């Protein structure tokens, strides 16, 4: 054991709790949306994509981590590490790029930079394809030799190798690529879209250009998406910051808890988005009941 055995027991219990909550709420989101025709809107396609991403993390990542934490180290070997790292990275990236597509959709619908533009089913499907392509471009390279997945923190789950300059893996270039393309770029796009969105909502309220009902509906959707973005960032910013710090200080001593806490806090994002969706979407709640 790298740390006190009680820490592994606590980790296993935490992962069990995430599975216990994460699987039903994400499955419920999928089931209710597919069952009720009126919920099958282009916007909800992206929200469904988020639920699929979360199920990736729950089924492919959380179950593995719960099992390995019972043993006190990653017992599933190289193949298991690759699979767990892939599913966790894939789920997190699909969720992040889904939030980017949602932010762009909100910007186009509310701010109307393109006159007479409607966000249709075709646009939603293109958005879905885009999220998967971007997620794969982040999760696949470590499987084929550009960086690698290794056990991290308490050695119960696997992630990208921020820790070493292992020969032949080009870890440095991959980590820089990952931070610029798969972290900073989405953050900049989301920040731009919501900056414009806030201005547009204020201007529309002042000018009373649209009916009160339309404005209220758009505000509710925008509020829900903003909450999803904030909760996602609260979960993932600590992990990204610690990973970058470790990458910039390779060779220094880091305790196993140092990376484990933010990594497992990040995993809780799999339950936040569906809960926000269920709590803040009246139409969904009515269909669920």
From Swiss-Prot:
Disulfide bonds join 81-158. Glycans are attached at residue 171. It is a multi-pass membrane protein. The keyword Phosphoprotein applies. A motif ('Ionic lock' involved in activated form stabilization) lies at residues 105-107. GO terms for molecular function: 11-cis retinal binding; G protein-coupled photoreceptor activity. The modification N6-(retinylidene)lysine is found at residue 267. The record marks 84 as: Plays an important role in the conformation switch to the active conformation. The chain crosses the membrane at residues 8-32, 45-67, 82-104, 124-144, 174-195, 224-245, 258-279. It is found in: Membrane; Cell projection, Cilium, Photoreceptor outer segment. CDD domains: 7tmA_MWS_opsin. InterPro entries: GPCR_opsins, GPCR_Rhodpsn, GPCR_Rhodpsn_7TM, Opsin, Retinal_BS, Rhodopsin. GO terms for cellular component: membrane; photoreceptor disc membrane; plasma membrane. Belongs to the G-protein coupled receptor 1 family. Opsin subfamily. Photoreceptor required for image-forming vision at low light intensity. While most salt water fish species use retinal as chromophore, most freshwater fish use 3-dehydroretinal, or a mixture of retinal and 3-dehydroretinal. Light-induced isomerization of 11-cis to all-trans retinal triggers a conformational change that activates signaling via G-proteins. Subsequent receptor phosphorylation mediates displacement of the bound G-protein alpha subunit by arrestin and terminates signaling. This is Rhodopsin. It comes from Cottocomephorus inermis (Longfin Baikal sculpin).
